[in-house]
Amino acid sequence: MISVTPEADLPPKPVKVVVAEDEVLVRLMVAEVLRGEGFQVFEASNGQEGISILKTMPVDVVITDLRMSSRADGLELARYVRTHCPGISLVLASAQAPPITEDLTFDAFFIKPYPPEDIANWIRRRRTSTRDHAESGLG
């Protein structure tokens, strides 16, 4: 006999997060904290690697440094997310102020250096508010 488990009884799927950062230590630290919080993390050392990940699998959140020195920067990755991946939460990080452009919107901005736990907390709050919105019949 086949038993079917109601969807409500299934454990929640882990949030899939791309961390695009060219500074190795920053990327590793953010990824480690997010993994410790139960998120599934994919690392990219530049914008092009981030775009490649997005082309191969669905993700929930993209966190990108704006200024990366090699092969596509974070701004290119952010524009790709907004153009090709509607519904993905976009988090920008930089030591400088966020760019003011009419063609780019983002969901959060963190000024470097930032505690990686702040991003983990933001993702959890975002997920909770999105789930509450959907359950209310408004989403």
Go through the PLM ranges and name each one.
Residues 23-42:
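Two-component/phosphorelay signaling modules centered on CheY-like receiver
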Residues 24, 45-49, 117:
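Acidic phosphotransfer microenvironment of two-component signaling modules
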Residues 43-61:
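Acidic, metal-coordinating helix/loop segments flanking the phosphotransfer/catalytic sites
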Residues 55-57, 80-88, 99, 104:
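Conserved phosphotransfer cores of two-component systems
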